[in-house]
Amino acid sequence: MKFYASSQIGIGKAENEDRIILGKSVIAGGSFITNIENGIVAVADGVGGNNAGEIASHFVATRLSNAQSVSFESLSQINTDLIDLSHVNPQYKNMATTLSGINFNKDKTLIFHIGNTRVYALQGSKYLKQLTNDDTTLNYLLVSGRLSPEDAISFDKKNEIIACFGGGTAALFKANVSAVDILSPILITSDGIHDYLSVDELEDTIDNYGISLQACERLIELARQNGSKDDASVIMGGVE
């Protein structure tokens, strides 16, 4: 299966806190094409409001790149080790990262997720279906009916997450790992992309450019045009 990926540091930022995992490779910037039959493809986004987001995302991404498979238990151990690492250096205090991805292997395909990075499936070569639920205060309030879609537009804590790796406490680790049938291409994005592009814009770009590196780079360009100053990362590819 062929995968295309691109990651770009945010405007005015010193470090890219996003990490892309493509099999055994961890990517902190640039554009890449690779073939993966069995392995992990994922995006980790270091939490910008905490210390050392790039350390957290790189730590989790590196551990995943060295793994053969994913399970809730293996992710939980990575989380424990990340929290332990955060105690070593005061500059690492409460460091945290999100993570969303797919583990392809011969026996079964797994989707794993925590935070507000996203995985989509491209159905019928045209329509995106979001396979993950955002672990954010905003989404929680919307799903619980405590906030209307109209009020959500002006909600001032849209990026506040309620689950992640690290964050100084194991209570924030609420990862979801489940088996899934992937019969179509996938799209994985950090919030520097999907917070600034509508589903229609995502779909139109893929329709215009196909599943390609050009499409990945165009999504980042469009997000920038729409005001994104955040790190922006995209993976697309897989079953066609």
Where are these regions (language model features)?
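PP2C/PPM-type serine/threonine phosphatase catalytic domain
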Residues: 1-240
